[in-house]
């Protein structure tokens, strides 16, 4: 018996809505990354983008446990000597909660062309409203 290998043309994609209000950032991000990658499907193939589209709402109400709001830093470097910029997650979540969520998911996806394709299927919104009603997304209940 041969193993099934998905073709890019045969993949059927669904749309899901995830409500992140009151849930830990890492737990929501890991499950969203798994769906974007397609690991929830029996036809998962590692070298084919077989994931679904995900809409995340209420990104501003996501929670970080413990002292992570003040101790966890978002780091970026200008590539010049002494060019490290550190911002605590409290400021990041106040100013750009969508960016904080996208960064968490991006770091859980593969690096390279396939990972960038997967990340394009993620739509993150600050509030409860989104622009994708025409796609008829299903509400996705997270496992934990």
Swiss-Prot record:
Keywords: Ribonucleoprotein, Ribosomal protein. One of its GO terms (molecular function) is mRNA binding. GO terms for biological process: negative regulation of translation; translation. This protein is one of the early assembly proteins of the 50S ribosomal subunit, although it is not seen to bind rRNA by itself. It is important during the early stages of 50S assembly. Part of the 50S ribosomal subunit. InterPro entries: Ribosomal_uL13, Ribosomal_uL13_bac-type, Ribosomal_uL13_CS, Ribosomal_uL13_sf. This is Large ribosomal subunit protein uL13. Pfam families: Ribosomal_L13 (PF00572). It comes from the Bacteria. CDD domains: Ribosomal_L13. It comes from Clostridium perfringens (strain ATCC 13124 / DSM 756 / JCM 1290 / NCIMB 6125 / NCTC 8237 / Type A). SUPFAM superfamilies: Ribosomal protein L13 (SSF52161). GO terms for cellular component: cytosolic large ribosomal subunit. Belongs to the universal ribosomal protein uL13 family. PANTHER family: LARGE RIBOSOMAL SUBUNIT PROTEIN UL13M, RIBOSOMAL PROTEIN L13. PROSITE patterns: RIBOSOMAL_L13.
């Amino acid at each position: 018996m041969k193993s099934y290998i998905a073709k890019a043309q045969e993949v059927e994609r669904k749309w899901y809505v995830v409500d992140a209000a009151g849930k830990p950032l890492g737990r929501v991000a890991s499950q969203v990354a798994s769906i974007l990658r397609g690991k929830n499907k029996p036809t998962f193939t590692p070298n084919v983008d077989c994931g679904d589209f995900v809409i995340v709402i209420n990104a501003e109400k996501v929670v970080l446990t413990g002292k992570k709001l003040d101790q966890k830093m978002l780091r970026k470097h200008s590539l010049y000597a002494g060019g490290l910029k550190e911002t605590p997650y409290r400021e990041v979540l106040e100013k750009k909660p969508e960016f904080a969520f996208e960064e968490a998911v991006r770091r859980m996806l593969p690096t390279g062309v396939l990972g960038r394709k997967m990340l394009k299927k993620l739509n993150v919104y600050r509030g409860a409203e989104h622009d994708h009603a025409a796609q008829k997304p299903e509400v996705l209940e997270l496992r934990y």
